[in-house]
């Protein structure tokens, strides 16, 4: 690997979506953690800290919901995965403790929703897929479907459980109802007595000491059977809004204690299901529960948005345990104008766990600064000359002064309208134009870009282009030339430019008036515009990088730079270079605006933006937090 291909380092912010745990048998402090983007993490201290271990495949869309460690050989690990938006996934095998993986060809393309290993025979493996139930008797070397092929009932198998006393007894929960076989899959029968019809069965567990006791969770509630599933009764105590119980987990030391991880918090029963109590806030979405077999007071939760939560007191209290774990979708990234070690990041999809973050040590540690944002997504960050931060969100603009700890709305639209009135002067009717203030209103759509470099501040939003001459206290504007959705803005001296997907407009009077620019006819979608210090306007589009040095009279294509589908284009004034990246690529390109010479780096991650911090580059990734260029990385020169 060349220095330019040295993988960049993810430095946070910690947290994000965590999916599934696996503990090494006999080594409860040694854990693995699956994610929604093909990565697996490892912990050697019981989940106190994590390190990014490996990626199952080059794709970044595998949801890893099941990791199983062979109890005979801890270096042998299985990882089962599926893909969110289409039927795909598979099974991967590692023989070196998770450092490298090979796909199991027999299950290639199978969307594996459940996976289990026989408690008394580790050679027996079971996979529940969208097609049905599959079984391997040789530790995954070969697989056979044991549910009826083409069955209209036993498919979309979300949960599996194997009787610890009899591996031929298998429970399968589908998106419709639970099923059972007692002969290794030769025959199946529905076990729906007591279960509300059309119940998605998310999790099934069997009491290892009393296998006739079976718990099942469904969208209609939690059920318990005392007859090996032949009859169920619904357990009371879980609110109807929290009945999407994704995981059930029994305390190995106290079988009367069962944890239920729901979409509205963690519930716990200590009396075998007679009563349940909420142990977390109801905004916690629980995907998995891990109970330390050596210390059942030590509990880990894999959650959406909040990452890993840890308890050392039997779930009475939880705290984040995400050191080294970062699965954040970072959309905004800026470096403090006066301190290159101070970084700000804006994330999306994490609601109250997201918003904005600050690092004062170059990414080594992060602090959430989201008070006042109300769980909004942050798509853009900008810093004013006085240090005030502006955040463009999915619902307006917010400001954070240097001496404040809470964001305040800065989204007031105060337009002035020109109205024509008819009056009679000295017997003659004349038309008089009057300027009147429009009713104040608030921006309520997404803010795509903010530029604070000129005398007037500039914002691109779903509602159009807005300018402010009072540091964001009020904004003026709206649709420009009859079009509202603008994605990017930039300013240089008295010039302003704004881009929408199919065009660019230019203003020479601080945004009072706009006129359309001529653009190359080959362009089908524009994402970004930026001025360099010499007044050149750069344009990032689906077809590549284009630029004009005469306000659109003529355009040139920077065809030597081998990148298309450009999503971010940024002028780095300190180094006089144009930085370019794409969400469909892990490459970063830097171009000299005068000579058009270019360099490249390969980061190893899909990117949403690239910025400079002193002598190093930073990147906002699509799924893996903020990335930092390693000291060893040396850019490769591009071909001329």
What are these regions (language model features)?
Residues 2-40, 51-52, 288-294, 298-312, ...:
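An edge-strand/N-cap motif at the start of beta-rich repeat modules
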């Amino acid at each position: 690997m060349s220095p330019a291909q040295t993988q960049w380092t993810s430095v946070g912010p910690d947290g994000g979506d965590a999916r599934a745990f696996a503990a090494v048998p006999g080594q409860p402090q040694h854990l693995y953690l699956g994610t929604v983007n093909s990565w697996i993490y490892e912990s050697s201290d019981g989940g106190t800290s994590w390190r990014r271990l490996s990626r199952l495949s080059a794709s970044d869309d595998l949801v890893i919901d099941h990791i199983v460690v062979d109890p005979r050989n801890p270096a042998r690990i299985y990882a089962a995965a599926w893909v969110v938006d289409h039927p795909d996934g598979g099974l991967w095998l590692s023989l070196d403790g998770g450092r490298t993986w090979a796909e199991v060809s027999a299950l290639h393309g199978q969307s594996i929703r459940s996976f289990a290993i026989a408690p008394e025979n580790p050679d027996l493996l079971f996979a529940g897929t969208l097609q049905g139930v599959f079984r391997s008797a040789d530790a995954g070397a070969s697989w056979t479907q044991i549910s009826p092929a083409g069955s209209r009932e036993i498919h979309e198998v979300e949960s599996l459980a194997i009787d610890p006393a009899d591996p031929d007894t298998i429970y399968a929960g589908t998106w419709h109802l639970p099923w059972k076989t007692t002969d290794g899959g030769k025959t199946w029968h529905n076990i729906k007595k007591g279960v509300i019809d059309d119940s998605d069965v998310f999790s099934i567990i069997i009491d290892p000491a009393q296998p006739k006791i079976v718990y099942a969770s469904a969208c209609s509630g939690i059920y318990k059977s005392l007859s090996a599933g032949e009859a169920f009764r619904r357990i009371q105590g879980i609110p109807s809004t929290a009945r999407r119980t994704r995981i059930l987990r029994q305390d190995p030391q106290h079988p009367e204690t069962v944890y239920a991880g729901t979409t509205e918090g963690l519930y716990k029963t200590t009396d075998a299901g007679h009563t349940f109590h909420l142990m977390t806030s109801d905004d916690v979405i629980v995907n998995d529960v891990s109970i330390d077999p050596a210390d059942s007071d030590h509990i880990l939760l894999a959650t959406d948005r909040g990452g890993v939560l840890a308890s050392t007191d039997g779930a009475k209290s939880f705290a984040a345990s995400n050191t080294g774990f970062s699965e954040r979708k970072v959309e905004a990234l800026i470096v403090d104008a006066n301190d290159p070690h101070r970084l700000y990041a804006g994330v999306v999809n994490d609601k109250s766990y997201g918003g904005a973050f600050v690092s004062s040590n170059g990414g080594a540690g992060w602090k959430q600064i989201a008070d006042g944002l109300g769980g909004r997504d942050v798509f853009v960050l900008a810093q004013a000359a006085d240090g005030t931060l502006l955040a463009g969100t999915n619902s307006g603009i917010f400001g954070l002064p240097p001496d404040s700890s809470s964001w305040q709305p800065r989204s007031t639209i105060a337009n002035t309208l020109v109205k024509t009135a008819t009056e009679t002067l000295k017997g003659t009717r004349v038309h008089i134009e009057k300027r009147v203030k429009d009713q104040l209103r608030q921006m309520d759509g997404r803010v795509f870009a903010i530029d604070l470099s000129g005398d007037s501040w500039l914002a691109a939003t779903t509602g159009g282009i807005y300018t402010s001459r009072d540091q964001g206290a009020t904004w003026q504007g709206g649709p420009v030339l009859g079009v509202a959705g603008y994605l990017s803005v930039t300013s240089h001296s008295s010039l302003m430019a704004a881009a929408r997907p199919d065009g660019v407009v230019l203003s020479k009077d601080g945004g009072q008036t706009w006129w359309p620019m001529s653009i190359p006819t080959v362009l089908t979608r524009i994402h970004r515009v930026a001025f360099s210090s010499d007044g050149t306007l750069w344009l990032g589009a689906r077809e590549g990088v284009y630029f004009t040095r005469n306000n659109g009279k003529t355009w040139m294509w920077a065809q030597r730079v081998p990148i298309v589908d450009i999503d971010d284009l940024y002028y780095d004034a300190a180094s006089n270079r144009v930085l370019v990246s794409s969400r469909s690529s892990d490459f970063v390109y830097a171009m000299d605006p005068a000579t058009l010479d270019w360099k490249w780096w390969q980061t190893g991650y899909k990117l949403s933006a690239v910025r400079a911090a002193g002598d190093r580059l930073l990147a906002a990734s699509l799924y893996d937090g903020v990335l930092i260029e390693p000291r060893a990385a040396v850019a490769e020169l591009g071909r001329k």
